[in-house]
Swiss-Prot record:
Contains 8 disulfide bonds. This is Cysteine-rich venom protein 23. GO terms for biological process: defense response. It comes from Naja haje haje. It is found in: Secreted. Keywords: Disulfide bond, Secreted, Toxin. Not toxic when administered to crickets at doses up to 5 nmol/g. The keyword ATP-binding does not apply. GO terms for molecular function: toxin activity. Belongs to the CRISP family.
Length: 14
């Protein structure tokens, strides 16, 4: 997934 994105962006992946 978007592992290169910051934590705040990874939350959207959920």
């Amino acid at each position: 997934d978007s592992s290169n994105l910051p934590p705040n962006q990874k939350q959207i992946v959920d």
